[in-house]
Design a protein with these regions (language model features):
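C-terminal alpha-helix plus adjacent terminal tail
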Residues: 1-12, 44, 53-56, 168-173, ...
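Conserved CoA-thioester-binding segment of acyl-CoA-metabolizing enzymes
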Residues: 1-54
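Terminal peptide-recognition signature
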Residues: 14, 18, 33, 51, ...
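Charged catalytic carboxylate motif
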Residues: 28-32, 88, 95, 193, ...
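Acidic-histidine catalytic/liganding microenvironments
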Residues: 43, 63, 99-100, 241
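Glycine- (often His-adjacent) and acidic-residue-rich active-site loop
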Residues: 53-95, 111, 141, 223
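Crotonase-fold acyl-CoA enzyme core
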Residues: 95-209, 245-249
Length: 262
């Protein structure tokens, strides 16, 4: 299975592994995400997910796997439009975006086309100095699907999103300065840093991290006052949790809290 799954404590690591084709994105990745993400969401032992590329491929993902026999083709434009919401890639990316727990992209090299879009379907990005984002679709006479331009503009603003949409690359240092990557590290330290970030997130009360993610994403889509009012309900829901009581007690006693996810 080209989408590899490894468990380290409370951290699940998903690796795009097609190194002979620079981890090109095929339907098997979509199928793997559709199979694994619901399982990981239900697994109480999993508190955070890392998505990365097999470093033997020299890339996070070099884009769509054009040799994949399952690649969607349609007899007509009408058929293609009708099929769009049902495409496995579209469904997989929605699952990734809507996944309740935090997802960290560890970008180890080129993230091109669909591989580029996958990184900012995640919540946090740790970038290697070798990372580079590219959207070549407009140069091929098409558009980035799966919300490729819309999602990017929400991360970095209109100007940089427009630049990337027009085919200009975004290198690691620029991505870090623009806020697309929250951490930029030497290449050989990428997974160490990604695990450090993941383990910190995993150490937090998981119900609180889930609602914090929900609050940030919800706030992008609604007026400020509506988002702020919704936060009050999330706050009150967390007031009733065991982890909230334990965290406050541990703070008073100057000790590490025993987080249970309840």
């Amino acid at each position: 299975m080209p989408l590899l799954h490894e468990q380290r404590g409370h951290v699940a690591i998903l690796t795009l592994s097609r190194p002979e084709a620079r981890n090109a994105w095929g339907e098997d990745y979509n199928d793997g995400l559709k199979e694994l993400l619901p399982q990981l969401e239900e697994d109480r032992n999993v508190r955070v997910v890392i998505l990365t590329g097999d470093d033997r491929g020299g890339a996070f993902s070099a884009g769509a796997n054009i040799k994949d026999p399952k690649t969607h083709t349609s007899a007509s434009i009408a058929d293609a439009i009708e099929a769009l919401p049902k495409r496995r890639r579209h469904q997989a990316f929605n699952l990734l975006t809507d996944f309740a727990k935090p997802v960290i992209a560890a970008v180890n090299g080129y993230a091109v086309g669909i591989g580029c879009i996958a990184t900012y379907c995640c919540d946090l990005i740790v970038a290697s100095e070798k990372a580079e984002w590219r959207l070549p679709q407009v140069g091929l006479g098409i558009l980035p699907a799966q919300g490729g331009t819309v999602r990017l503009s929400r991360w970095v603003g209109r100007g940089i999103a427009m630049r990337v949409a027009m085919g200009f690359p975004l290198k690691a240092e620029e991505a870090y300065r623009a806020g697309l990557a929250q951490w930029l590290v030497p290449h050989d330290e990428l997974m160490v840093k990604a695990m450090e970030v993941a383990e910190h997130v995993a150490s937090l009360p998981p119900l609180a991290t889930r609602l914090a993610k929900e609050a940030v994403n919800f706030g992008l889509d609604v007026p400020l006052r509506e988002a702020a009012n919704a936060d009050l309900y999330r706050f009150m829901a967390l007031e009733l949790t065991e982890d909230k009581a334990e965290s406050h007690q541990a703070w008073r006693e100057r000790r590490k809290p025993q987080i249970k996810g309840r």
